[in-house]
Amino acid sequence: MNAQDKLTVQSIRRAVQLEGLKQGEVNKFAKFLKEMDVLLRERLSGEELTTFKRNRLEKLLKDVGEGMDAILAENSAQLKDSMNQIAVSESSFEAKSLQLAVGEATKVSLPILDEVKKAVNASPLHVRGADGGKLIEPYIEDFTTREKQRIVGAIRQGVFEGQTNGEIIQKLRGTRANQFKDGILDITSRNAEAIVRTGIAHVATTARNETFKANNDIVDKVEWQSTLDGRTSEICRSLSGQQFPLNSGLRPPAHWRCRSTITAVLNSEFAYLSRGGQQSSMNGTVSADLTYYDWLKMQPVEFQDSVIGVNRGNLLRNGGLSSDEFARLQLNKNFKPLTLDDMRKLEPLAFVKAGI
């Protein structure tokens, strides 16, 4: 296995390990969710709020908000501390991976770890949508503000609609019949999971990229690596295998809960052997240089159609397009998904050939 393949395989294995680490951080939120549950039940266990005059109600809502702030602030502090540790770990891991790939004769530099942490906080999130461009600390703080407002707003709305304390608590906690999955606190829990998974992806990617930049005499650019299974998003399917300069271009996470990663593309002096490594997919190991649509072409027709839809599946199989051509047809220059009509305008002959 040559140096480039070693790096690719190491990056993909690390991405799998990182998913386990994300789950561990998600699990830590259960403590804070329980504290919120206790806080709300305590504050709503007395007199019916519908009997409160406005000033008294606002005082109670302020008390609830301050309690939420304290709980979520502790969660944010813990998450930020974990992210700092992850940044250091990922940067060090990539330096070791580079050293292993290129051999002891070539010196690999470890970036200054304080600079890595600064880069994590100064680099914008690449997620598409409203959170795109945010820095990581405001991204976490916005979650705290949003969830507090959601809960305080639900209490205020319940009072003005004449709901009893019990009904308001049920709206917040959910019902036992639905395993409490239908309450506002479950929304908070799911949003916390997304924040953790997305935030850690950003931290890990930025830390890796800083190591690559510190070794720009060895690393030429970065390559996008997407998870090879049926849950991979449209944007990540199309970005699979694309290469970007060290100092520009899109980076994971491309969306909430993104599982993609980047791997270093070595300078030509280190990539002198043919590729032959392997990476993991949902149905076993495959070639390390296989892109998402290369892999998808190897899957059963039913699976292809379930992932990308019947028409796109037909186009992939019968349109006469290579995997790279098909991938380029999925996104515009701003990495936004194209509709079938948009795709038809760009490649009308492929649609004719596929009979669409």
Summary of predicted features, one role per range:
Residues 1-178, 272-356:
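N-terminal leader/targeting and assembly helices and adjacent pre-domain segments
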